[in-house]
UniProtKB/Swiss-Prot annotation:
Its EC number is 2.7.7.56. Belongs to the RNase PH family. SUPFAM superfamilies: Ribonuclease PH domain 2-like, Ribosomal protein S5 domain 2-like. This is Ribonuclease PH. It catalyses: tRNA(n+1) + phosphate = tRNA(n) + a ribonucleoside 5'-diphosphate. It holds the Pfam family RNase_PH. The keyword Electron transport does not apply. Homohexameric ring arranged as a trimer of dimers. Keywords: Nucleotidyltransferase, RNA-binding, rRNA processing, Transferase, tRNA processing, tRNA-binding. Phosphate binds at R86, G124, T125, R126. PANTHER family: EXOSOME COMPLEX COMPONENT, EXOSOME COMPLEX COMPONENT RRP41.
Length: 238
């Protein structure tokens, strides 16, 4: 039994609330256990210079954490003058994950920006951000269709993410902060609704792992992501 009384293959309680921001084209507040992330999607009628006059759009993301999202206050990165390497890595991961699910040639020269702001952190902030960001993005594209600015939905597939790890030699799904800090191996997995991998980030923190352990962890992640995609579908498709 784990610190929060879950079984090894059990997700934390997940709740996704939409329409949290009346000013955003799409928004979702995702709660994965005690990790809470507010995701907001904005659509702008412009694209980066490398896409001008191509007829293609772009999807990108920004990620940040409130100072008291963590047990000890973390200073705002704006006071340091630039985002940290960790922040750059996470927001690029979110952007790549969203682009994997979208046909960039089907929504014109527009940019969809997803802001992911961590309100409370207890492990898995990047994976929660990806799962919530997809919902916000889907709602933003739906609004374009309702306003007749788009004829077809640019989304090709769903995308969601979760963490897995080896804690005390036991494969576990959806690690909280305490488990993550004790893990021998931790892994973040992003997959499509069709079961294809978008990204796998795996690190041996205290001991190396073999092919069989990696396969076991990715399959465990697959079961969790399938549950998350079902939740997304219930929200988006009603």
């Amino acid at each position: 039994m784990r610190t929060d009384n879950r079984t090894a293959g059990q997700l934390r309680p997940v709740q996704i609330t939409t329409g949290c921001l009346m000013t955003a084209e799409g928004s979702a507040l995702i709660k994965v256990g005690n990790t809470h992330v507010l995701c907001a999607a904005t659509i702008e009628d412009t694209v980066p210079p490398f896409l001008r006059n191509t007829g293609k759009g772009w999807v990108t993301a920004e990620y940040s954490m409130l100072p008291r999202a963590t047990a000890k206050r973390t200073p705002r990165e704006v006071t340091k003058g630039r985002p940290s390497g960790r922040t750059h890595e996470i927001q690029r991961l979110i952007g790549r994950s969203m682009r994997s699910a979208v046909d960039m040639s089907s929504f014109g020269e527009r940019t969809l920006i997803i802001d992911c702001d961590v309100i409370q952190a207890d492990g898995g902030t990047r994976t929660a951000s990806i799962t919530g960001a997809f919902v916000a993005m889907a709602l933003a594209f739906r609004q374009l269709i309702e306003y007749r600015a788009l004829k077809a939905n640019p989304i090709r597939d769903y995308v969601a993410a979760t963490s897995v790890g080896l804690v005390g030699g036991i494969p576990m799904l959806d690690l909280c902060y305490e488990e993550d800090s004790q893990a021998d191996v931790d892994m973040n997995v992003v997959m499509t609704g069709g079961g294809k991998f978008v990204e796998v980030q795996a690190t041996a923190e205290h001991s190396a792992f073999d092919d069989a352990q990696m396969a076991e962890l990715t399959e465990l992640a697959r079961t969790g992501i399938a549950q998350l995609v079902r939740m997304q579908k219930e929200i988006i498709e009603g």
